[in-house]
Amino acid sequence: MRHMQSVTRATSICGSGVKQVIGKGHPHARVVGARKARIPEREELSVKPKMVRNTHLNLQPQERQAFYRLLENEQIQEFLSMDSCLRISDKYLIAMVLAYFKRAGLYTSEYTTMNFFVALYLANDMEEDEEDYKYEIFPWALGDSWRELFPQFLRLRDDFWAKMNYRAVVSRRCCDEVMSKDPTHWAWLRDRPIHHSGAMRGYLRNEDDFSPRGPGLTPASCTLCHKAGVCDSGGVSHNNSSSPEQEIFHYTNREWSQELLMLSPELLLDPECTHDLHILQEPLVGLEPDGTALEWHHL
């Protein structure tokens, strides 16, 4: 009995000694058999192969022909002719509509005017900096009651977007692929004029240009297109005069230089003379501290 007590006591002392030794060991010592904590996220990323996204649409001939028949719809034809400046329906935006139809998996029987306007609105959402021009789509898609119905239209847009798995970004290469199938079709000749590229500063806008007009009304007059001699949706000039004042506006997108400064006919300069261009900086404050007017300064 005494022997058993001594053995038990010795075992407990030995065990406590082992614990003390382990507890006081080197702080960086690794216990035998211990494994490093696994990081599942890193392991999954290292094992998962790189995904190469295929941008090829693989459009079938019957899909292209169904889309071209849709473009010949009377309502869509009137809408496209209304967009004389090609701000909301140039060739790239129309190509995006066809790409959206393919990504959404629409049957050719679903190539309808409503789906066209929904997809075109989404394309403008994705690509255009000017947000207000696309509102012209509302009265064409919804009719006279568009102010009450446009929230439902926006829900249709969201549903269409979800049907594409939210893949609304279409590269220029993809658009060029769509247009390359039938490069002579009239829809792919709708080049937007160079003077309508980019965004416009807010204080230069005419608010009347942004109010939706809808069917039955003539498009708003565009000063830039009038100066450039562009009068139809194809961007072709109907002005046959060859005055120097008008010839400066007859550049195509490929011929236009980013360093070219476009002036109105009233400001044309003599090409045989040398001119110095001075840019004036507008003063931030109207008066000096003593009450005298500030002068403009050359930059």
UniProtKB/Swiss-Prot annotation:
Spans annotated as Speedy/Ringo box: 61-193
Keywords: Cell cycle, Developmental protein, Meiosis, mRNA processing, Nucleus
GO molecular function, one term: protein kinase binding
GO cellular component: nucleus
Subcellular location(s) of the protein: Nucleus
Disulfide pattern: none
Domain of life: Eukaryota
GO biological process: G2/MI transition of meiotic cell cycle; mRNA processing; oocyte maturation; positive regulation of cyclin-dependent protein serine/threonine kinase activity; positive regulation of MAPK cascade; positive regulation of meiotic cell cycle
Keyword Nucleus: yes
Keyword Phosphoprotein on entry: no
Pfam families, A to Z: Spy1
Family recorded in the similarity comment: Belongs to the Speedy/Ringo family.
Described purpose of this protein according to its UniProt entry: Stimulates oocyte maturation by promoting meiotic G2/M progression in resting oocytes, via activation of the MAPK cascade and cdc2-cyclin B. Also activates the kinase activity of cdk2; this activation does not appear necessary for oocyte maturation. Necessary for polyadenylation in oocytes.
Domain comment quoted from the record: The C-terminus is required for CDK2-activation, but not CDK2-binding.
Oligomer status and interactors: Interacts with cdk2. Interacts independently with cdk1 and with the cyclin B proteins ccnb1 and ccnb2, but doesn't interact with a cdc2-cyclin B complex. Prior to oocyte maturation, the mRNA is found in a complex with dazl and pum2 proteins; pum2 dissociates from the complex during maturation.
Annotated protein name in UniProt: Speedy protein 1-A
Origin organism lineage: Eukaryota, Metazoa, Chordata, Craniata, Vertebrata
